[in-house]
Amino acid sequence: METGPTGATGATGVTGATGPTGATGATGATGASAIIPFASGIPLSLTTIAGGLVGTPGFVGFGSSAPGLSIVGGVIDLTNAAGTLTNFAFSMPRDGTITSISAYFSTTAALSLVGSTITITATLYQSTAPNNSFTAVPGATVTLAPPLTGILSVGSISSGIVTGLNIAATAQTRFLLVFTATASGLSLVNTVAGYASAGIAIN
């Protein structure tokens, strides 16, 4: 017996009911963070004053820098009616989280610090208002190592990094990176010059 021709395809049936939602998948990897770079361009000149306290700080921007204004009562005021070079702050365009800060300093003049030690720090200051008054961000300080001591040639290097931070950075907050020096030992009044650079990671 011969098989007859194949008949026409029937109409498509009604779509079945949607099945239950599957289990939630594993959390994906954390997205890449933004890196904000800082470089002094010309050398900074940091000073310490009587008692080994912070004297003149250095403000560092994106390839430029300047001697900073005095830190009075923990506050830096950038209003500066004199109009000199002081505004090295940047503004956050979105909310984020600061996760790490690294900093570096290389001397550009020989130093004799026999019996004395100079410690350099880099601190992130913020103005959340935002306005021209900046205060240090808690936890956002890098102490550079090794400290400067003894007979130092040009190109002596100190550096440091702080990781594992979880510092909220809200949109429109202004941030300012400030290098300072403190001293201990025989000579408490000092000047140290050098190139400074740093970077902060913001998720």
Language-model features: where?
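Collagen/collagen-like triple-helix recognition
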Residues: 1-37
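Extracellular jelly-roll beta-sandwich "head" domains, especially the C-terminal globular C1q domain
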Residues: 29-203
